[in-house]
Amino acid sequence: RGLGDVYKRQENELFKKFDVKRGLRNEDGTGVLVGLTKIGNVVGYERIPGGGLKPIPGKLFYRGYDLEDLAHAILKEKRFGFEEVAYLLLSGRLPDREELASFRELINDNMPLEQKTKMNIIELEGNNIMNILARSVLEMYRFDPNADDTSRDNLMRQSIDLISKFPTIIAYAFNMLRHATHGRSLHIRHPQENLSLAENFLYMLKKDYTELDARTLDLLLVLQAEHGGGNNSTFTVRVTSSTGTDTYSAIAAGIGSLKGPLHGGANIQVTDMFHHLQENIRDWTNVDEIDTYFTRMLNNCLLYTSPSPRDGL
């Protein structure tokens, strides 16, 4: 233990001496500039004249639109908003009614999987959905006649195809693992034309779901749709794609990064959090008690020095 402390101290001294960036962060806590984008922007502090940083309430912008404004509009109008936000992020502008209807139809048309991919998910050995997702994404390369084309139009087509198929892959993988691990009946449901992406995901996952389930999932998808490209998995995709490799290889690399327990893999602890929540909330009718609990638990995002804009939503 003593020797480990010495190594740790020496490492810290060397990192400081040579200005090694830990976690893509400068010593003052600001992010390392690795690229420029107008797609997503994270704001968590403001610079003080003369030096230093001042924490401010976190803000997240999609193509210049405040995420909170987008989310509140979706909630107020009681509609499903993920497809609209995906269109905004991909194209740079919000769709009109006809464009949104066409985009939703395009998403639904691309949700079904190739029969070979479907069977491979069922037959794959393993107990981790993220690994199955990465392998399934790599397999999509086989069925794409223009897999290595990195032109803008083709990248757009591939992106829409991936957005469409992710819910199907994940739902099928979950049901397969539940069947293989817990002996549950295996149900493979086809996506429905009249459902939103969030509704289709829940339908394929468990068929019986409430409208609250679907609207909550839709909101979560909106909140997680983009994060500026500076976290580990999106940075991994940036590095991988900079070599000119195909889209599927780059996205699979990002999934591998996201799986890590120090990044998206931390989501596996959500189940534990629910148990913790049940043990620590005494009155489920007390909104203030529930709000205090979630504020305390969620106010720990490294990208924000004050509460994340996602917390309140």
Please provide the spans of the model-predicted regions:
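Single conserved hydrophobic/aromatic residue that forms the stacking wall/gate
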Residues: 1-7, 304-313
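A structural-propensity feature for long, helix-poor, extended segments
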Residues: 284-306
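Active-site-proximal helix-loop elements at catalytic-domain edges
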Residues: 32-58, 203-233
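Glycine-rich, mobile lid/loop segments that gate access to catalytic sites or pores
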Residues: 121, 125-228
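Short, hydrophobic/aliphatic alpha-helical segments
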Residues: 67-83, 215-218, 230-257
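Short, well-ordered loop/turn and helix-capping segments at boundaries between secondary-structure elements
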Residues: 91, 109, 261, 272-283
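Conserved phosphate/anionic-ligand binding catalytic regions in large, soluble enzymes, centered on
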Residues: 87-94, 244-272
